[in-house]
UniProtKB/Swiss-Prot annotation:
One example of a Gene Ontology biological process annotation: response to hypoxia
Feature: compositional bias, Gly residues: 613-633
Stated induction or repression of this protein's expression: Heat shock induces the synthesis of seven proteins at five otherwise inactive sites in the polytene chromosomes of fruit fly larvae. Two separate sites, producing two and three copies, respectively, code for the 70 kDa protein. Expression is induced by proteotoxic stress caused by toxic protein aggregation, for example by overexpressed Atx-1/ataxin-1.
Gene Ontology cellular component list: cytoplasm; cytosol; nucleus; plasma membrane
InterPro entries cross-referenced by the UniProt entry: ATPase_NBD (IPR043129), Heat_shock_70_CS (IPR018181), HSP70_C_sf (IPR029048), HSP70_peptide-bd_sf (IPR029047), Hsp_70_fam (IPR013126)
Family statement drawn from the similarity comment of this UniProt entry: Belongs to the heat shock protein 70 family.
Role summary: Stress-response chaperone protein that prevents toxic aggregation of proteins.
Name recorded for this polypeptide: Major heat shock 70 kDa protein Bbb
Region feature (Disordered): 609-641
Misc: There are 5 or 6 copies of the gene encoding this protein at two separate loci, 2 copies at chromosome locus 87A7 in reverse orientation (Hsp70Aa and Hsp70Ab) at locus 87A7, and 3 or 4 copies (depending on strain) at locus 87C1. Most strains have three copies at chromosome locus 87C1; two tandemly repeated Hsp70 genes (Hsp70Bb and Hsp70Bc) and one in reverse orientation (Hsp70Ba). Some strains, including that sequenced in the Drosophila genome project have an additional copy making three tandemly repeated Hsp70 genes (Hsp70Bb, Hsp70Bbb and Hsp70Bc).
Length: 641
């Protein structure tokens, strides 16, 4: 059973598999190689991917996207407050964690960001299963290099809820570097800078790639809250203000108008990567008012100027941390859809004194490509190209504990190789202190109050002794997923305690995860039931219209008037029933089908026999479907609304 690689993106996701010595990026059921990270809830069903994004203007309040901007964060995070201004769906606080409130099948539901992400992951898993023809459980999932511990844990939880065994969480730029290194058959030692600007996150990583097989991350930097969505937001704000100026109407109070404007803005942004001007035309945008305008590339660049410039700070930081200067970088590789923006490219090129940028890998697919390679390596694939690949990654943030006076004492420095283990000895602060509280933080500031609290635990039972005498050994063990285990041991008694850091404010408990796994299965069953219901409805609809058409077009003399009227009456009655019972259950559609078949089949058979008797030649059976009218055989045609 192959393992898959999933790029779980803010706006789009992508899945790949390594087979027969190469990576296949797998297209979804719509034929697209990337799938929108959107989940929509309606009064009858749940939609994931393209169908969800396609109906967003009709159902903005119950269509959820950007789950990656919520995952592993606390509700009071200032970034979330900023984002909520742009989201049409409702985000509420549930014990300090953000939850997304929607209406589903007439009921109010609350979902954790992990659950929404797990639905997208389930879609990617199903896409791969449809292509490979077998069930999949093992996967490598990518995260931004700058994701912190709680965001990584939450992503792993989302995989678990989706029924995946997450082999490894790997960093997106590292995955892209794998794709680049293997695709290009690199020789010698090369320093490669990966510039990864996606829909919602931004990462810069510098790697040394040796002979295309040793991939060593030297440094990483970034912003988990900068990407294409932020550029869209600037454009939407600009267009909404222009609309208000022109027509004295503020459309920002209307989620549907705002969503239509956002879709047009996103399209214009893409156009501006290849043209110097984009036209926006939206009919009846707000209160019947059409909106036609033009946006120039120069205006768009001016609107986002500070955001574009902000991409260079992490580049500078990554170079400093790797102790390299600009001239030592051999290749600059662009990853993520937003790197198609000409201004982003020109700023980066100027920063590197006119050095050519490498545009040779597909920016949308490179991360999934690398994840698929890593999945194959971790599941023991020994094929030629990847058997020698060794990937050495680093910790994005420093990790430490709080010592007297609120000082951050670091045990693991940022950019140290992972997996890694560090031990330090601490002591008590006051005489006869019976226990110590170990408070774990991540971040670069000197005082813990300015850093991110990860978790805390108490070690009790320390024998009475003057301050400074007891020896407490604290060990930080950072695993290959970038997830932290902390243990503390009192040396004289040998008493020990350890925790895997589970950021309690941002993390899900095991019980919550188990509940979500069960709910995910329930939703999958509901989706399947809905699909079967639609299949039964379509079968009945198709049958009734076929019978009606055959009878209406039957040549004179083939069918006596009484039979003809009897069939037409029954068909018209069924059509009326269909129109007024659109939400009927599968069993009701099946029952109607049986009823109609019982009534019509004998008459249809008689009609065809008469026809055959009269004509007696070949082709006399042309009105009847293969398999008979009562059967379900013959090809099923998907009908599009």
């Amino acid at each position: 059973m192959p393992a898959i690689g999933i790029d779980l993106g803010t706006t789009y996701s992508c899945v790949g598999v390594y087979q027969h010595g190469k990576v296949e990026i797998i297209a979804n059921d719509q034929g697209n190689r990337t799938t929108p990270s959107y989940v929509a809830f309606t009064d009858s069903e749940r939609l994931i991917g393209d169908p969800a994004k396609n109906q967003v203007a009709m159902n903005p309040r119950n269509t959820v996207f950007d789950a990656k901007r919520l995952i592993g964060r606390k509700y009071d995070d200032p970034k979330i407050a900023e984002d909520m201004k742009h989201w049409p769906f409702k985000v509420v606080s549930d014990g300090g964690k953000p939850k997304i409130g929607v209406e589903y099948k007439g009921e109010s539901k609350r979902f954790a960001p992990e659950e929404i992400s797990s639905m997208v992951l389930t879609k990617m898993k199903e896409t791969a299963e449809a292509y490979l023809g077998e069930s999949i459980t093992d996967a490598v999932i990518t995260v931004p290099a700058y994701f912190n511990d709680s965001q990584r844990q939450a992503t792993k939880d989302a995989g678990h809820i989706a029924g995946l065994n997450v082999l490894r969480i790997i960093n997106e730029p590292t995955a892209a570097a794998l794709a680049y290194g293997l695709d290009k058959n690199l020789k010698d030692e090369r320093n490669v800078l990966i510039f990864d600007l996606g829909g919602g996150t931004f990462d810069v990583s510098i790697l040394t790639i040796d002979e295309g097989s040793l991939f060593e991350v030297r440094s990483t930097a970034g912003d988990t809250h900068l990407g294409g969505e932020d550029f869209d937001n600037r454009l939407v704000t600009h267009l909404a203000e222009e609309f208000k100026r022109k027509y004295k109407k503020d459309l920002r109070s209307n989620p549907r108008a705002l969503r239509r404007l956002r879709t047009a803005a996103e399209r214009a942004k893409r156009t501006l990567s290849s043209s110097t001007e984009a036209t926006i035309e939206i009919d009846a945008l707000f209160e019947g008012q059409d909106f036609y305008t033009k946006v120039s590339r120069a205006r768009f660049e001016e609107l986002c100027a500070d955001l574009f410039r902000n991409t260079l700070q992490p580049v500078e930081k990554a170079l400093n941390d790797a102790k390299m200067d600009k001239g030592q970088i051999h290749d600059i590789v662009l990853v993520g859809g937003s790197t198609r923006i000409p201004k982003v490219q020109s700023l980066l090129q100027e920063f590197f004194h006119g050095k050519n940028l490498n545009l040779s890998i597909n920016p949308d697919e490179a991360v999934a490509y690398g994840a698929a390679v890593q999945a194959a390596i971790l599941s023991g694939d020994q094929s030629g190209k990847i058997q020698d690949v060794l990937l050495v990654d680093v910790a994005p943030l420093s990790l430490g504990i709080e010592t007297a006076g609120g000082v951050m004492t670091k045990l693991i420095e940022r950019n140290c190789r992972i997996p890694c283990k560090q031990t330090k000895t601490f002591s008590t602060y006051s005489d006869n202190q019976p226990g110590v509280s170990i408070q774990v933080y991540e971040g670069e500031r000197a005082m813990t109050k300015d850093n991110n609290a990860l978790g805390t635990f108490d070690l009790s039972g320390i024998p009475p002794a003057p301050r400074g005498v007891p020896q407490i050994e604290v060990t930080f063990d950072l695993d290959a997923n970038g997830i932290l285990n902390v243990s503390a041991k009192e040396m004289s008694t040998g008493k020990a305690k350890n925790i895997t850091i589970k950021n309690d404010k941002g993390r899900l408990s095991q019980a919550e995860i188990d509940r979500m796994v069960n709910e995910a299965e329930k939703y999958a069953d509901e989706d399947e039931k809905h699909r079967q219901r639609i299949t039964s409805r379509n079968a009945l609809e198709s049958y009734v219209f076929n019978v009606k058409q055959s009878v209406e077009q039957a040549p004179a003399g083939k069918l006596d008037e009484a039979d003809k009227n009897s069939v037409l009456d029954k068909c018209n009655e069924t059509i009326r029933w269909l129109d007024s019972n659109t939400t009927a259950e599968k069993e009701e559609f099946d029952h109607k089908m049986e009823e109609l078949t019982r009534h019509c089949s004998p008459i249809m058979t008689k009609m065809h026999q008469q026809g055959a008797g009269a004509a007696g030649g070949p082709g006399a059976n042309c009105g009847q479907q293969a398999g008979g009218f009562g059967g379900y055989s013959g090809p099923t045609v998907e009908e599009v609304d």
